[in-house]
Design a protein with these regions (language model features):
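Sec/Tat signal peptide C-region and signal peptidase I cleavage site
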Residues: 20-24
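Bacterial N-terminal signal peptides that target proteins for export
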Residues: 1-10
Length: 340
């Protein structure tokens, strides 16, 4: 027994599970859509101080301008405490005419030609043709429990936490347990001699700005409906806490993407995160994300996303498996085993 599902439905299920009932109670359905995110204020894109051929040149230039970086202590380092959620960003405008979060993975948008290399532009046109035909990209890597990776991490609309220390910064996303570790004042190290979903990130502080260089990233995409990235993708980010017109905290990330196999020249965008004290008040916490043993979605022969349902031989019970189902206390939900 199989059923055709849209990726939009699958994404909604994941979002509800990730953010919890408290999030759903606080925001309306419309308020959590990409269209509403696209209406949120977003700062102007800040281009690099001059053109750079590589991320390494860009990063080292900023490091020199910062005289080696600010040496923070635990008493001086910026604190980005609390829970955060993704806001608006300008990335779709790199690849689409009048691109925004409202049309990034929906039909009707026109591709900007001459941004991608010929081979990657050809692939992007094929992806957008699928969006035009079916109203969406039929299959997304997340369906197979693959990591969103960089740069998709910057936008993923889930709960995040940021912890800054003098020697490291931890950027934690509840989706897929994706924690970015930025090693402050360090060099890139790759003892495994391979690429990674989140790459390898080093950084330095320039006052209250955190500058980050990420490389060795697995090929992925910018987000569903957007172009692919290659295994030569790198990016340079600057992170800074600001306040919007209402006085609310926000994190602003100015980023430049470098990808010689996919981009004709480096491209820049700005991303934002909103402080969400309401989530903390409602008791939302980041939990361990579990996907591989509970996901019943898969890619069908026609390229669409389908789901196994109870009764299918391949169906996996999201409550898990036990050799002793009759033994009290073996359920993953302790409510069912509570004494009456």
């Amino acid at each position: 027994m199989q059923v055709r599902k849209t990726l939009a439905i699958g994404a909604a299920v994941l979002l509800t599970a990730a953010l919890g009932v408290a999030y759903a109670q606080d925001r309306t359905k419309q308020d959590s859509t990409a269209e509403e995110q696209a209406k949120l204020p977003v700062p102007q894109v800040e281009l690099p101080p001059k053109p750079f051929k590589t991320a390494e040149e860009h990063y080292k230039y900023l490091l020199e301008k910062a005289h080696g970086g600010t040496k923070h202590t635990m008493s001086t380092i910026p604190v980005w405490g609390g829970l955060w959620a993704s806001g608006n960003n300008t990335m779709p405008a790199i690849f689409l005419v009048n691109g925004s979060l409202s049309n990034a993975w929906r039909p009707g948008a026109k591709i900007k030609e001459g941004v991608l290399t010929p081979t990657y532009e050809k692939q992007f046109k094929q992806r957008r043709a699928e969006v035009e035909k079916f109203g969406e990209q039929l299959y997304d890597r997340l369906t197979n429990c693959e990591y969103p990776g960089v740069p998709r991490w910057l936008w993923e609309p889930y709960v995040k936490e940021f912890v800054n220390m003098p020697d490291q910064s931890w950027f934690m996303n509840d989706m897929m347990n994706e924690t970015r570790r930025i090693y402050i004042g360090a060099e890139h190290i790759n003892t495994e001699a391979k690429h990674f979903p989140l790459g390898d990130s080093i950084g330095f502080w320039d006052g209250d700005k955190l500058v980050v260089w990420t490389k060795w990233v697995n090929p992925a995409d910018y987000v569903r409906g957007m172009p692919l990235t290659s295994n030569q993708f790198e990016m340079v980010e600057t992170w800074q806490e600001r306040h919007n017109a209402s006085g609310e905290r926000m994190l602003v990330t100015q980023v430049t993407f470098y990808d010689p196999l996919a981009l004709l020249k480096p491209q820049s965008a700005v991303y934002t995160h909103e402080s969400r004290p309401d989530l903390k008040k409602d008791g939302v916490r980041i939990r361990t994300w579990e996907c591989d043993s509970s996901s019943n979605s898969y890619k069908a022969a026609d390229g669409s996303t389908q789901f196994y349902l109870p009764g299918d031989p391949q169906y996996k019970n999201p409550r898990g498996f036990t050799d002793f189902p009759d033994l009290p206390g073996q359920s993953l939900n302790p409510i069912f085993d509570a004494p009456q």
